Swiss-Prot record:
Protein name: tRNA uridine(34) hydroxylase
Known role: Catalyzes oxygen-dependent 5-hydroxyuridine (ho5U) modification at position 34 in tRNAs.
Entry-linked PROSITE patterns: RHODANESE_3
Active site, renumbered: C185
SUPFAM superfamilies in the cross-refs: Rhodanese/Cell cycle control phosphatase
GO molecular function: oxidoreductase activity, acting on paired donors, with incorporation or reduction of molecular oxygen
Keywords: Oxidoreductase, tRNA processing
Catalyzed reactions per annotation: uridine(34) in tRNA + AH2 + O2 = 5-hydroxyuridine(34) in tRNA + A + H2O
Domain of life: Bacteria
Pfam annotation, one family: Rhodanese
Length: 312
């Protein structure tokens, strides 16, 4: 019986020929029937792939044969190839699009000048020692924090990683520059870069969590400082660290607790992801993001008795 798994991984290391790495990775994944998304740049590699567990193990072995990836850590998650529509392997200026390709410097040890790495237990120890002085700083898109975040975290008003530089240069967070700031994100990669960008802009004591939220949640479940669900970028949309998790998200229409993001019914112009409970999503009249144009489209569909989910 085939057992599916998902691999999450990244490595910051100098790549002199990203195009050659792209071709090799594509051929390797195709030969192992893996699907997912891999980004490659001169700074390294960032990937999420899924497939049969034995094929995933073979992928790890083969990928680690490349000298720059020999020590790369792979995180396992539930799922499989079916959680991804296809295989995508691309070369980009950055493996995370902060819009600062020339600011980031890497060597064989990773990003130069990033925040101090903390293991999950060291995060708790820092909070025990420094108390309320410690600030958790969300390194994800603001939307992701709607369903889960570290307790009392600062959540920057950003829609994409491209927004972060403008946000941290805005002056909103200048009062944090002398405080211990723990940046966090899903698997750690965004904070490798964000922590470096913050240090370059005057933040004096910046940390990042080894393995990100995923590793922290694996260690402490719902008994630590993390609250709620974790947004993930595949068909699952979210994951939890046990059954007794706190539900932070609420339906935008009826305020029912939910951790499920759904697309707005306005497929041509919007498709925004918003939190909707099953009942409101099932009703085409409330299957919208709340914007005036989308409300009108949903009302028109309902009046005509048309439900795109039924007619697809």
């Amino acid at each position: 019986m085939s057992i599916g798994k998902i691999l999450l991984y990244y490595a910051f290391t100098p790549l002199s020929d990203p195009k050659a790495v792209q071709l090799w990775q594509r051929d390797l994944c195709e030969s192992l029937n893996l699907r997912g998304r891999i980004l490659i740049s001169e700074h390294g590699i960032n990937g999420t792939v899924g497939g049969d567990i034995n094929d995933c193990k073979a992928y790890i072995r083969k990928t680690r044969e490349y000298p720059g990836f020999a020590k790369m850590e792979f995180k396992w998650s539930e799922g499989g190839a079916e959680d991804f529509p296809k295989l995508s392997v691309k070369v980009r200026d950055e493996i995370v699009a902060f819009g600062a390709p020339n600011e980031i410097k890497v060597d064989e040890n990773g990003i130069i000048g990033g925040g101090v790495h903390l293991k999950p237990e060291e995060v708790n120890q820092l909070v025990e020692e420094r108390g309320d002085e410690v600030v958790f700083f969300d390194g994800r898109n603001a939307m992701e924090a709607q369903i889960g975040k570290f307790r009392d975290a600062v959540v920057p008003d950003v829609n994409t990683t491209h927004d972060f530089i403008k946000e941290i240069e805005s002056g909103k967070y200048d009062d944090l520059k002398d405080k211990p700031v723990v940046t966090y994100c899903t698997g750690g990669i965004r904070c490798e870069i964000l922590s470096s960008l913050m240090i370059n802009r005057g933040f004096q004591e910046v940390y990042q969590i080894d393995g990100g939220i995923v590793r922290y949640g694996e260690k402490f479940g719902n008994q630590g400082l993390w609250e709620g669900s974790l947004y993930v970028f595949d068909k699952r949309m979210h994951m939890e660290f046990g059954e007794d998790y706190k539900r932070l998200g609420h339906c935008i229409h009826c305020d029912t607790p939910t951790n499920k993001f759904e697309h707005c019914v306005n497929e041509d112009e919007c498709r925004q992801l918003v939190l909707m409970c099953p009942d409101c999503y099932a009703n085409v009249e409330t299957r919208h993001c709340g914007q005036d144009d989308c409300v009108e489209i949903a009302a028109d569909l309902a009046a005509r008795g048309v439900d795109p989910l039924v007619t697809q």
